[in-house]
């Protein structure tokens, strides 16, 4: 029963890491990355549809994304969605494909994005600490209900803290790597 608490906390922390990785993937780093377009939804036959479900996204060059719609009639809808997005990238269409050239980041933009990365990383660490608190509360509840002994509670708290420390360390590494990637010229 006690290990279940640690495993559940570990699983929730893994989900936080995955969420952070997705969020970092959507932060533009001056080079083409298909995950930049993950948040783009296109109104396709009256339904909001994720872009990657109605078009293939390829990276022919380091700073170019190529969007090839499966249905050529949807190209105007895709262009409209890309223009309305907060990417800051103007799509260029030749009628069958849409080319997105990722502009080089200015030094100021790089610093702003690095601040954003730090903020997102801090939010992820807060989520990890909340998971730790929930796990600790569950362990204390079990000890109070006499399901585990006081010694088992102390061991469990140490295990939860170790898992938390590992998760926070991993988030720090992810954040540092993303910052380094952003600040590279």
From Swiss-Prot:
Subcellular location: Cytoplasm
InterPro entries linked to this entry: Ribosome_recyc_fac, Ribosome_recyc_fac_dom, RRF_sf
CDD domains (alphabetical): RRF (cd00520)
Cellular component, GO annotation: cytoplasm
Gene Ontology MF annotations: ribosomal large subunit binding
Alphabetical GO biological process terms: translational termination
Described purpose of this protein according to its UniProt entry: Responsible for the release of ribosomes from messenger RNA at the termination of protein biosynthesis. May increase the efficiency of translation by recycling ribosomes from one round of translation to another.
Protein name according to UniProt: Ribosome-recycling factor
Species in which this protein is naturally found: Streptococcus sanguinis (strain SK36)
Lineage: Bacteria, Bacillati, Bacillota, Bacilli, Lactobacillales
């Amino acid at each position: 029963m006690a290990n279940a608490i640690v495993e559940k906390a570990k699983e929730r922390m893994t989900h936080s890491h995955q969420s952070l990785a997705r969020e970092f993937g959507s932060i533009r780093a001056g080079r083409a990355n298909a995950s930049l377009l993950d948040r783009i939804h296109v109104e396709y036959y009256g339904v909001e549809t994720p872009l990657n479900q109605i078009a293939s996204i390829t990276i022919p060059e380091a700073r170019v994304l190529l969007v090839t719609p499966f249905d050529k009639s949807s190209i105007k809808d895709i262009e409209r969605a890309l223009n309305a997005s907060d990417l800051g990238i103007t799509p260029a269409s030749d009628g069958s494909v849409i080319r997105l050239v990722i502009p080089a980041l200015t030094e100021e933009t790089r610093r702003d994005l690095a601040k954003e990365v730090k903020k997102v990383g801090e939010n992820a660490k807060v989520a990890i600490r909340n998971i730790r608190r929930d796990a600790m509360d569950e362990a204390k509840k079990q000890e109070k209900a006499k399901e585990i002994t006081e010694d088992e509670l102390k061991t469990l708290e140490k295990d939860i803290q170790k898992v938390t420390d590992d998760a926070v360390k991993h988030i720090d590494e992810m954040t540092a790597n993303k910052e380094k990637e952003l600040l590279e010229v």
